[in-house]
């Protein structure tokens, strides 16, 4: 595993946190209690509506967003790379994306910032079917592993292999796009890296395939927030009231999901009728522990500064980023808009 940041990085984190407070200085100091009118607020999902978005749909259905003055409208992207591009272009108000994608976008100069974590740890996993005789990462030696062709997934695979003492040259990486499950079922690859333990793994279990599932953060990849809520940095300075209201309402939505996962699954199903109901409910139930911070007393959405620093440093060391995120000035995230986190 990657070790903790040395003292200079810890100092950089402290400086970054000070910048975070300045970043949101224009935001509300107290949680929103009521609002007489509503303002349209467009949120582009990271992918099609699914269990990962249950809190969002619950907050919409229960009127939590309307209660704080927001008329939230989810938008489905045409491709996975679209949300952050649309956000940077000013065409949407918020994007649900991935911590690695946000760091890549910022490295290219996009002034974006995460205001909350929707899923607090990696969902990305190495998945294999029993017939391939893969029970540990070491068993991948000499085999073909499928990925979606995403740069940081290749780096995650290499890190996992090196962590297990396997020469990456002994493993053939195959780009199977988003056809991860078909590639395993057909035997095209012995395993995949890119599927989620709360989705593709459950899908295979429902098919009685009994997959082996190895989350990447358990085999050498630093922990990171799989899904984050991203806004433009300028809006984080000027629209603090709306962002605080959004997070307050979303927190209520998360509590509703936790209280009644079955009802939340029906809302997700209504948003995307093509989904398999059993898969959505099981996915919601298994994802619930990952929706809250590991640190006791921290609110829903909390982002760990040490964790972000370690993962950003890992991406830089892997050659995925041109600059170390700790040295770029504007922090990649802020916790300022979470309920109870204002000053």
Residue ranges and their predicted role:
Residues 2-14:
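Bacterial N-terminal signal peptides that target proteins for export
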Residues 21-25:
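C-terminal motif of bacterial Sec signal peptides marking the signal peptidase cleavage site
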Residues 27-29:
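Bacterial signal peptide processing site
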Residues 32-177, 181-198, 213-215:
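Short, glycine-/small- and polar/acidic-enriched structural segments
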Residues 100, 179-182, 188-274:
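Pocket-lining segment of extracytoplasmic ligand-binding domains
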Residues 168-172, 273-285, 322-330:
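Short, surface-exposed acidic
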Residues 238-318:
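Secondary-structure end/capping motifs
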Residues 308-343:
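Conserved C-terminal helix/tail region of periplasmic/extracytoplasmic solute-binding proteins
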């Amino acid at each position: 595993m990657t070790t903790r940041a040395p003292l200079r990085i810890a100092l950089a984190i402290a400086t970054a946190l000070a910048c975070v407070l300045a970043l949101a200085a224009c935001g509300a100091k107290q949680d929103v209690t009521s609002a007489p009118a509503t303002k349209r607020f467009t949120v582009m999902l990271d992918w099609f509506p699914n269990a990962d978005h249950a809190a969002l749909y619950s907050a919409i259905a229960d009127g939590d967003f309307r209660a704080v003055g927001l008329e939230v409208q989810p938008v489905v992207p045409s491709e996975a790379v679209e949300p952050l591009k649309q956000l940077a272009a000013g065409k949407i108000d918020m994007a649900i994306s991935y911590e690695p994608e946000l760091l890549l976008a910022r490295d290219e100069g996009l002034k974006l910032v995460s205001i909350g974590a929707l899923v607090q740890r990696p969902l990305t996993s190495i998945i294999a079917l029993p017939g391939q005789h893969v029970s540990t990462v070491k068993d991948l030696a000499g085999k073909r592993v499928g990925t979606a062709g995403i740069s940081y997934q290749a780096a995650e695979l290499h890190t996992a292999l090196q962590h297990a003492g396997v020469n990456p040259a002994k493993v053939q990486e195959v780009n199977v796009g988003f056809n991860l499950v078909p590639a395993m079922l057909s035997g095209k690859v012995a395993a995949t890296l890119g599927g989620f333990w709360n989705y593709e793994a459950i899908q295979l279990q429902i098919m009685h395939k009994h997959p082996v599932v190895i989350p990447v953060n358990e085999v050498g990849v630093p922990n990171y927030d799989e899904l984050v809520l991203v806004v433009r940095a300028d809006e984080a300075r000027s629209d603090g009231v709306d962002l605080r209201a959004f997070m307050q309402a979303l927190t209520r939505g998360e509590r509703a999901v936790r209280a009644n996962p079955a009802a939340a699954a029906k809302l997700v199903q209504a948003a995307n009728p093509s989904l398999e109901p059993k898969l959505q409910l099981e996915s919601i139930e298994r994802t619930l522990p990952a929706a809250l911070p590991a640190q006791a007393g921290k609110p829903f959405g909390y982002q760990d500064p040490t964790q972000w620093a370690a993962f950003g440093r890992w991406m830089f060391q892997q050659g995925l980023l041109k600059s170390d995120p700790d040295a770029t000035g504007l922090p990649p995230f802020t916790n300022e808009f979470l309920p109870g986190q204002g000053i």
